[in-house]
Structure formats: C-alpha cells, structure tokens
Amino acid sequence: MDGIVPDIAVGTKRGSDELFSTCVTNGPFIMSSNSASAANGNDSKKFKGDSRSAGVPSRVIHIRKLPIDVTEGEVISLGLPFGKVTNLLMLKGKNQAFIEMNTEEAANTMVNYYTSVTPVLRGQPIYIQFSNHKELKTDSSPNQARAQAALQAVNSVQSGNLALAASAAAVDAGMAMAGQSPVLRIIVENLFYPVTLDVLHQIFSKFGTVLKIITFTKNNQFQALLQYADPVSAQHAKLSLDGQNIYNACCTLRIDFSKLTSLNVKYNNDKSRDYTRPDLPSGDSQPSLDQTMAAAFGAPGIISASPYAGAGFPPTFAIPQAAGLSVPNVHGALAPLAIPSAAAAAAAAGRIAIPGLAGAGNSVLLVSNLNPERVTPQSLFILFGVYGDVQRVKILFNKKENALVQMADGNQAQLAMSHLNGHKLHGKPIRITLSKHQNVQLPREGQEDQGLTKDYGNSPLHRFKKPGSKNFQNIFPPSATLHLSNIPPSVSEEDLKVLFSSNGGVVKGFKFFQKDRKMALIQMGSVEEAVQALIDLHNHDLGENHHLRVSFSKSTI
C-alpha cells in the first residue's frame, strides 16, 4: 500500500489519511487488492468514511508498531475491556492493524485509556490513535477466514458467561476509582482439583499485567493475593472471573479487593512469585506444590510439559457439559475460560488459537476406559469426527481399553475433549485427556498391529475439510436427539424409525423439517443410544446416491 509511510518521530500523531492517501476519495472507497495483498495477503477491503481531521473520535482505531508475529486474537484483546470489537483489518506486512468498536463511546474510552497507559504486546510497546474512517467493511474472501473466525470467537465470549458487554463500564469505574487497590484476594471454593500459582497466573493474565502472587491456606481454604499493574485490570478481572469455575463444576473463584495496595514477596517458588524480581531466592524449605497436591488428592502423576501441571486428577470426576476455565498444559481442564463451545468452534473453523484455549498446540487425545470387546478405530473415528477431522486412531495393542486419537489441530482436540469426556460408549464412560504425544505413529511394515491403527488423513468422511466450514456452527454435545440430513424423497418416516431401532435402540420421537424433507430429527431412548446410532448409521447408504448424515442436535422433539 503506497499510502502507508514509515513511522515518523515519536510524539507526532499521524492521521490515517496518510495511510490511504493514494486510494482515498470523498465518500466510499476501496483499498486496492494489490496494496492489501502486499501488506497482508488479504483480498480487497472496502471502507466507508469521510474526510476527517486526525484525532477526531471514530469507531475505527488505528494500531501501529505491532510485533511481527502478533495474532488476530491478541489485537482484538486490546479492545475487549472497552466494548465489542465488530471488525478487524490486519496489515501484518506493515505491523499495523485497524479495529472497529461497536460504539464511538467505546472507542473513545479505549483511546483515552491507552493514551495514559501505553499498551504492550509481547514485550513491545504499541501505539493507538483514532482512524479518520467511520467504519471498516471487509469482503467475504477466503483470506478473511482467520480474522472473521477470531471475531466470531470473541463475540461468542462476549455473549457467554463473561458478560463482557459490561466491561466498558468496568473500565470507566476503575479509572474513576484512582484509589482502588490493584490487589485482589482470591478464594478457591469446592477444591476438587489442584490449583497452582501458575494456573492462577495463566487465568488472570488475560485481564492485565500480573506483578505478584502469594498463595496460602486459611480456614481450610486455598487462597491467593494477586497484584496487578493497575486497578483497572483488577476491576476487569474481578467482574469477569468472580463466581467462575476453573475446572468443570468445581474450583470456584471468589474474588474481592484486598485492603493491601502492594504485596511484599520474599521468595520465588510454588507458593509465591514476584514477576518483576526474577532474582529472588526460591526458599527451599517448602516442598513443591504439585507434589503436595498430588499426594493430597491421592491421584497418580501425569507427564506434563509444565512443571506446575504434574498433579493427576481423580479419573471418575467428569461432568462434560459444565463450563470451566481452561488452563494450558493442565490435563483434565475441559472448557476454555468461560468461552462457550461456539468460540472454540469458531477458532477451529479459522484454524486459529484463542489465547487461553487449553491445549491449542496439542492435537492428540488419550482416550481411556474403553470397552476392549467392542471398540474399533472406525467407531472412534466416526464419534470424534463430529468435532473435527480425525487424522489417525490407534487402539493400544497391550491395553485395548486405551486409544490415541489425533485431530487436525489443537482446537478440534479441545472441542472433542470438552464435549465427549465422561459420556458412555459401549456401556462405559470414556475419559479423555491431552496426550503427551504430538502425533500418532503408524506401525512399521511387518509389525503386528491387528488393524488397531488406522490413518484417516484422506478420508472422504471428514466434516470440516474447508476452512471456515459452516459445520463448525452446528457442533453440539451428545444428546438423545439426532439431526439427520441428506434424506432422499423415497425414504419415509417409518423407514428411518426401523433403521434406527435395528440395533436395539428405542426411537421415542421423529419429525421431518417442515420446509425441507431432506432433514429430520429423531429422538432415541437415551444419550448413549444416540451415540451408538450415530456411530452405526452416519454415512449409511439410503439409496439413490444418498448417504445419511447424522449429528447431535441442540433441539428436542
């Protein structure tokens, strides 16, 4: 883009007219596809704007001096505390971006705040100012998939448990309370699983710079004091996290402001940490937290990439549909930070990683407590294929109650784990964790395998082959009601009822879609029966070149 010029002397504020000087006209205008691809490989972007002087409030905000490897999610996160981000344009070749807020008031609050507090991404200060354009308008080209998937993920967050719609008010309140403490007092109730200092740091860092943490036990409760760099971050974290669960249905956060205004940390170890003083001694008198917690919970250790994530979790505790916060590198942490499944699905659709999404880099799942007499690679391929494109499946030769399932990426693995863990398959509740393996190895030529390892990398049954596939918008947890599609006109309701009851299941209800008889809902006697029916009948040949498509439904009959 010829109109984008190198940054000039610090302290001189530039209007965005300089960025688009070669392609701006009065009224609506278009960035040329050549200039856009030169900057970021994106297709042409359309804008509607008018001539405005630099610094005049606008919903569109110009961000400069971004790190080279910055992600869409990180850029969007700059605007989250102030309101809803409605559009995004990345110019990675120029280390710049434009974001559009839902209101001018939100944008104004954001610019005012970052004028007094310089934002930092990946250790690098960045610069924020108003754009002279009233709105961003992007097209629907394939190259926009990542940005749009990121926005969809964030919008799912904002409409979900975090209630970030109130965050602009939170920022205003925090800025108005100059005397408010930046220190939070955190109590973790219903402590079924270990909560470590690093777990708290991962969660609370989403809302600002964490300076210090001290953990302790008081009145038989695990507690912590956490100091942010500023009161605004503390206010945002309190509003967003108070009452949330770290893990499924347990480890509930209760958060209040501390009377302290600063923490004095003497040691950097598993109980306390000063992130501004890496030179502090460790104080070897205390045993490491992961060892003591593992002993307290009586659970076996699990190999983990994180030294603070070694404690095992009780294997029988699994409530798959309860939302929790995600903890990277901690096995058993299911749902992401109060992010509904739609957010993870949107991320998977765009092949992006949401900051804070558990296991974003690990695509291999360890599935245990399988029925060794009935489980097959094909049954696992079909079931896990509801939540992503399964690449390989290996049932362990000497431990056939265990299997490895490799998904296309870490987001899909997260979706499968959060939806399927604890559900019954062949009469047994399966348990799912992230595997320590990065991929599933195929057997060597001549090696005895008994057909227990299968490669599905090129399977025609993959549901999500296209980036941004609409199938990601229709992912739901296992339920007794199944959604059927691709039904030929010659197949009747009775035909389908007979088909779905042929393997011993009970059909409790059925109805065709009024406007489209190619689709129907069928209700089985239980969730377990529906799971088995999906495995048995997805891709079933109904004749007339129609293969039945089966998925879980959010609706009931």
Curated annotation (Swiss-Prot):
The modification N-acetylmethionine is found at residue 1. InterPro entries: HnRNP-L/PTB, Nucleotide-bd_a/b_plait_sf, PTBP1-like_RRM2, PTBP1_RRM1, PTBP1_RRM3, RBD_domain_sf, RRM_dom. The keyword NADP does not apply. The modification Phosphothreonine is found at residue 138. It is found in: Nucleus. One of its GO terms (molecular function) is RNA binding. The modification Phosphoserine is found at residues 16, 141, 459. One of its GO terms (biological process) is regulation of alternative mRNA splicing, via spliceosome. GO terms for cellular component: extracellular exosome; membrane; nucleolus; nucleoplasm; nucleus. Keywords: Acetylation, Activator, Isopeptide bond, mRNA processing, mRNA splicing, Nucleus, Phosphoprotein, Repeat, Repressor, RNA-binding, Ubl conjugation. CDD domains: RRM1_PTBP1, RRM2_PTBP1, RRM3_PTBP1, RRM4_PTBP1. It holds the Pfam family RRM_5. Residues 59-143, 184-260, 363-437, 480-555 form the RRM domain. There is a cross-link at residues 65, 218 (Glycyl lysine isopeptide (Lys-Gly) (interchain with G-Cter in SUMO2)). The modification Phosphotyrosine is found at residue 127. PANTHER family: MATRIN 3/NUCLEAR PROTEIN 220-RELATED. Monomer. Part of a ternary complex containing KHSRP, PTBP1, PTBP2 and HNRPH1. Interacts with RAVER1 and SFPQ. Interacts with IVNS1ABP (via BACK domain); the interaction is direct. Plays a role in pre-mRNA splicing and in the regulation of alternative splicing events. Activates exon skipping of its own pre-mRNA during muscle cell differentiation. Binds to the polypyrimidine tract of introns. May promote RNA looping when bound to two separate polypyrimidine tracts in the same pre-mRNA. May promote the binding of U2 snRNP to pre-mRNA. Cooperates with RAVER1 to modulate switching between mutually exclusive exons during maturation of the TPM1 pre-mRNA. Represses the splicing of MAPT/Tau exon 10. This is Polypyrimidine tract-binding protein 1. It comes from Homo sapiens (Human).
